[in-house]
């Protein structure tokens, strides 16, 4: 399509080489300790539980109907109690749009959300609570009102001209006409794509990452639309040039801050694609295959979706070093996918929070907020209580909250052990207190019934049985085959970590376990985590 796509990245390499990259990924073993089990220290994001926030909709503290940084600061106690220990803020920069994915100034914060001092205060208060904060980094494109683009568009001789992608004639894909030729903007005309074949653009982006990591002190970035960075010859996604650019980017930002974390959005990626980007290009990728597995197995009452997602992961990403989620800000809210079915919402949360992979919870998911597209309606004000405007603001919000807020809200669910909020809280704390649930190996088991999902999580810290009845009917026809798990030891006790009831130890005769039926009948949507004591 365009010859300039074949530029080499030599200049970029030179640029990043000056930054004396520090090797970072190598885990350092803990010094001798009195604890029996010693493990290599994991990067902080491997054991985190993230919470995605749309700032505009979280909490308004200055009565303008728009959520703000101070609002998040005021709600940090809520988030800490919930148990999350990392936050992803959707775009916080000045922008002409309500969502912020078209940036006007990468060095400033959106004045509607507060001042830079407000933002720094949020960072400090979060740090006090051991909560990490990452922000959206929108690098594929700027706003068409960004000063770079205004200059590039009005003056073809400007050095900013080559910050973007131009052609005399519209080619394949999304080209937009101006007085001085056509520019490429994959998503829409208001978002002109940056030209990463131009080392100057790469230099600008690294200045921006350095500013946020080292001047401001954030912990990393969620990198937007990462598969679209560099188009080559009409190929618009996942090009070798994009991968090459990301490899240099990885070296550069790790040199700026060895503890910095990036997670890339590769929309729709399953484990085989996640694998290509992870480790040498970005720290994490969202695994959409796992997400569909959690949601579809729950919705359909059959284990095939989650079982195949896990099998794909075992093949391509056996350490499950990726991020998981149920739905995000680009998808209908998961409670709407489940038509308001509380049992299903609880089941999906259980599947995600007992599986390996770093979970991301979308704000409001934990109380069962609903929302279906258009996009504005999946990003509505958080429902804090039954007061007017859902307790989000004292004035009419930027967009009205869902009408169910009088029943569905944080205040109503807090302390109610049957609520979705307390279910999330219990599962998050269970995960944090049992590192096996975070990062251990997962071994799928067969129970002879497609309505049952059962696996063992096994590492040096313990052996945990995760068991769920995905259906709305009781199941008594089942038996778990523990022999598939390759367990060497016998067990003398069980500890019920999640779920009601008492159960017995799996019996072993000789080399093999008897078929295991921890409960005669599994109630509809029953969920258990049982620790086996050797
Ligand atoms: Ca406000
Ligand atoms: Ca692009």
Q: How would you name each of these model-derived features?
A:
Residues 145-191, 293-315, 379-405:
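Core domains of carbohydrate- and sulfate-ester-processing enzymes
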Residues 1-4, 19:
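Positively charged n-region of N-terminal signal peptides that target proteins for export
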Residues 14-38:
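Ser/Thr-rich, Proline-interspersed low-complexity disordered segments
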Residues 41, 45, 253-256, 261, ...:
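Loop/helix patches that line or flank the sugar-binding groove of alpha-linked glycan CAZymes
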């Amino acid at each position: 399509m365009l010859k300039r796509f074949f530029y080499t990245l030599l200049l970029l390499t030179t640029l990043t080489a000056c930054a004396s990259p520090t090797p970072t990924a190598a885990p350092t073993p803990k010094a001798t300790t009195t604890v029996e089990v010693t493990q290599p220290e994991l990067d902080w994001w491997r054991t985190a539980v993230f919470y995605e926030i749309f700032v505009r909709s979280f909490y308004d503290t200055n009565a303008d109907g728009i959520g703000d940084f101070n609002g998040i600061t005021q709600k940090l106690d809520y988030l800490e109690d919930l148990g999350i220990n990392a936050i992803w803020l959707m775009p916080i920069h000045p922008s002409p749009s309500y969502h912020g994915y078209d940036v006007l100034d990468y060095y400033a914060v959106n004045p509607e959300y507060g001042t830079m001092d407000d933002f720094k205060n949020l960072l400090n208060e979060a740090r006090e609570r051991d909560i990490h904060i990452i922000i959206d980094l929108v690098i594929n494109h700027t706003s068409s009102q960004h000063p770079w683009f205004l200059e590039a568009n009005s003056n073809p001789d400007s050095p900013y001209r080559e910050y973007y992608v131009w052609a005399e004639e519209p080619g394949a894909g999304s080209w937009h006409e101006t007085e001085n030729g056509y520019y490429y903007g994959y998503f829409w005309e208001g978002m002109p794509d940056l030209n990463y074949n131009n080392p100057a653009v790469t230099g600008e982006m690294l200045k921006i990452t350095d500013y946020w990591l080292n001047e401001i002190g954030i912990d990393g970035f969620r990198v937007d639309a990462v598969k679209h960075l560099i188009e080559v010859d009409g190929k618009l996604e996942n090009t070798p040039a994009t991968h090459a650019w990301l490899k240099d980017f990885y070296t550069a930002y790790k040199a700026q801050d060895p503890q910095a974390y990036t997670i890339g959005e590769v929309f729709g990626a399953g484990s085989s694609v996640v694998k290509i980007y992870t480790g040498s290009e970005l720290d994490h990728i969202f695994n959409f295959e796992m997400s569909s597995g959690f949601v579809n197995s729950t919705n359909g009452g059959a284990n095939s979706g989650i079982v195949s997602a896990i099998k794909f992961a075992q093949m391509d990403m056996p350490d499950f070093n990726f991020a998981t989620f149920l739905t995000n800000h680009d998808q209908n809210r998961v409670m709407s996918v489940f038509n308001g079915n509380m049992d299903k919402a609880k089941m999906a949360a259980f599947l995600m929070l007992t599986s390996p992979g770093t979970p991301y919870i979308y704000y409001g998911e934990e109380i069962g907020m609903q929302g279906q597209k258009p996009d504005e309606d999946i990003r509505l004000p958080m429902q804090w209580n039954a007061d007017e405007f859902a307790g989000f603001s004292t004035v009419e919000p930027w967009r009205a909250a869902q009408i169910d807020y009088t029943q569905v809200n944080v205040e109503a669910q807090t302390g109610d052990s049957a609520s979705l909020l307390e279910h999330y809280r219990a599962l998050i704390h269970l995960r944090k207190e049992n590192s096996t649930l975070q990062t251990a190996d997962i071994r799928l088991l067969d129970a002879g019934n497609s309505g049952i999902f059962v696996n063992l999580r096994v590492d040096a810290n313990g052996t945990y049985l995760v068991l769920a009845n995905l259906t709305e009917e009781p199941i008594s026809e089942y038996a778990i085959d523990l022999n598939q798990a390759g367990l060497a030891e016998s067990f003398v006790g069980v500890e019920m970590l999640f779920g009601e009831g008492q159960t017995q130890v799996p019996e072993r005769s000789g080399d093999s376990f008897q078929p295991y039926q921890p409960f005669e009948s599994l109630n509809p949507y029953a969920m258990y985590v049982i620790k086996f004591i050797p």
